[in-house]
Amino acid sequence: MALFGAHVSSAGSILKTFKRAKDIGAEVFQFFLRSPRAWYWKGVDKETKQAFIEKLKDFKNPVMVHAPYLLNLASPNEELREKSVKVFLEELKFCDEVGIHFYNFHPGTAKGISDEEGLRNVIKSLEEVFSEYTPKFTTVLLENTAGERGDLGKNFKELKEIMNVFRGIKLGVCLDTCHAFAYGYEINTKEGFENFKREIEKMVGLESVKAVHANDSKVPLGGRKDRHEHIGKGYIGLEGFKNLLKDEYFSTLPYYIETPKENNMDPVNLSVLREIYQNNDL
């Protein structure tokens, strides 16, 4: 059964995320542990941590933490790469300790180096992470990217290269619909969607996809820019989300919207997804 939710703010306290999710009718939710554009994190005090654990147990459905945007595990700058590994480790440990289901990250950006070198750096960084800490509960999700500015993980061949190194580690994929479409996957036609599924199955296996970031795209197919739009209002359109939500496998996953936040649109976007999912006439 598909579950629908959104990215919510953790401003003030991570405990506030549950109420913010409830207020928009979210069955699942995602949040940042720290400002996505800051390295510093004051951490979580013992009382807040315990309260969060209890709330999470009551919530039951999958909660996702998104890694900060500053992280770049692919960076040729050793100081930046090591800093990224440190933050990744810090957040992954916390997620695993409190029972967060998913820790999601962008593989990284190959700035000034080849994609191959960048992928080697990502693998090196993850080796450093997992040699120090192996999650027992939390699944680490690699998010596909739009391929903008050297972003890695833009296709499932690249994701496979990373994931194949870490057999036995709780790894999976978070499919971002906007990123996939902007890269060039034609998920809004029947034929394009079937080709897309075949590539996933061939490269990483459908079962590797554990969650979906449901976002329409402000850029056309292959536009290679990460620009999210409201569901049904962009170039993917309702057909793309219908392909996903009527599919035997993708209709079983949790969906997290990261659509523009203006005018309290989260409940509207969630209702559009639910209507597609529940209406057999569509």
Swiss-Prot record:
Binding site for Zn(2+) 2: E143, D176, H213, E258
List of residues binding Zn(2+) 3: H179, D226, H228
Keyword Nuclease set for record: yes
Molecular function, one GO term: zinc ion binding
HAMAP family in alphabetical order: Nfo
Any one Gene Ontology BP term: base-excision repair
UniProt-listed Enzyme Commission number(s): 3.1.21.2
Protein source organism: Aquifex aeolicus (strain VF5)
Top class in the EC scheme: hydrolase
NCBIfam families, sorted: nfo
Cofactor notes: Binds 3 Zn(2+) ions.
Record flagged with keyword DNA repair: yes
Name by which UniProt lists this protein: Probable endonuclease 4
Keywords: DNA damage, DNA repair, Endonuclease, Hydrolase, Metal-binding, Nuclease, Zinc
Cofactor(s) needed: Zn(2+)
Reaction equation(s) it catalyzes: Endonucleolytic cleavage to 5'-phosphooligonucleotide end-products
Family to which the UniProt record says this protein belongs: Belongs to the AP endonuclease 2 family.
Chain's role: Endonuclease IV plays a role in DNA repair. It cleaves phosphodiester bonds at apurinic or apyrimidinic (AP) sites, generating a 3'-hydroxyl group and a 5'-terminal sugar phosphate.
Positions with a binding annotation for Zn(2+) 1: H66, H106, E143
InterPro entries the record matches: AP_endonuc_2, AP_endonuc_F2_Zn_BS, Xyl_isomerase-like_sf, Xyl_isomerase-like_TIM-brl
Gene3D superfamilies in the cross-refs: Divalent-metal-dependent TIM barrel enzymes
